[in-house]
Amino acid sequence: MTCSRRDMSLSFGSAVGAYERGRPSYPPEAIDWLLPAAARRVLDLGAGTGKLTTRLVERGLDVVAVDPIPEMLDVLRAALPQTVALLGTAEEIPLDDNSVDAVLVAQAWHWVDPARAIPEVARVLRPGGRLGLVWNTRDERLGWVRELGEIIGRDGDPVRDRVTLPEPFTTVQRHQVEWTNYLTPQALIDLVASRSYCITSPAQVRTKTLDRVRQLLATHPALANSNGLALPYVTVCVRATLA
């Protein structure tokens, strides 16, 4: 049975532990570029377990986290008990009009319905506010990372796929940051296990995929007998200003 796009977008709750253990955070340079200098109150839309939320809170910002998956928000609330965390979606944001300086969407814009989300984001932003989108994509120029992609699927490039932000947003800009995430072999397995494709696959397909990743870890010259891995990323950013 084929999962719908919506079902895939909501599947992460069943793998929340793997998601939290395996997914990377976001580089400071990307966050610097996405945020307007004067931002004080920021909405992390599609916050998940709080990978980006944590980085925003560390900057002393007043952050509101919104996500449609209760299990993800439970993890976020446990880690950031002082942060407001609300159940909601990009199509129905549970905030007042003109209430935030920036809306950041990390690793989630590809799940939303832009026709419904754009008016909602514009509604909650203050005039001149910023919408920022960000994706961590594996840098598959490195041999073993390319082989990983052959097992679990290539990482899409949102810029290549022509993400657009229509009116009332203007001055759409794009930026990339190259960086390296350091993780354990088990965290790499968790990263794979937290992907929507893996979560929603039949059990035998999921098991085979994870076994192939373990085989790569055990046999690739750059990975075998290693307690730590360096996984290169290209973080893709898109930002636009509310007219």
UniProtKB/Swiss-Prot annotation:
<dbReference type="InterPro" id="IPR051052">
    <property type="entry name" value="Diverse_substrate_MTase"/>
</dbReference>
<protein>
    <recommendedName>
        <fullName>Uncharacterized methyltransferase Rv3342</fullName>
        <ecNumber>2.1.1.-</ecNumber>
    </recommendedName>
</protein>
<dbReference type="GO" id="GO:0008757">
    <property type="term" value="F:S-adenosylmethionine-dependent methyltransferase activity"/>
</dbReference>
<dbReference type="GO" id="GO:0008168">
    <property type="term" value="F:methyltransferase activity"/>
</dbReference>
<comment type="similarity">
    <text>Belongs to the methyltransferase superfamily.</text>
</comment>
<dbReference type="InterPro" id="IPR013216">
    <property type="entry name" value="Methyltransf_11"/>
</dbReference>
<keyword id="KW-0489">Methyltransferase</keyword>
<dbReference type="GO" id="GO:0032259">
    <property type="term" value="P:methylation"/>
</dbReference>
<keyword id="KW-0808">Transferase</keyword>
<dbReference type="InterPro" id="IPR029063">
    <property type="entry name" value="SAM-dependent_MTases_sf"/>
</dbReference>
<dbReference type="Pfam" id="PF08241">
    <property type="entry name" value="Methyltransf_11"/>
</dbReference>
